[in-house]
């Protein structure tokens, strides 16, 4: 689906930024449906970062190896694992009637904390 690919591209572009995700501008347009897809893309991205930190190869975002390697160099493994747990919880709560924009902001800030050591 073109919309799905475009959203994945947008999320990956945000996660790839050397200076960290631009939390407010990215999160402004996130609704509940987009939040669910965002959490999924973030989970697969974080899994690839953890794999790189453990001297393995990325599994999900093989088209983004240079960006993943750059992020993995600065990321701390314990923070990535904490972020992975937070994303797992977010995925469980995505159907909850919370404010999707605020949830997206929170997750992107947590990502920045994990990858901008």
Language-model region placement:
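Charged, glycine-rich active-site and insertion segments that engage polyanionic ligands
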Residues: 1-117
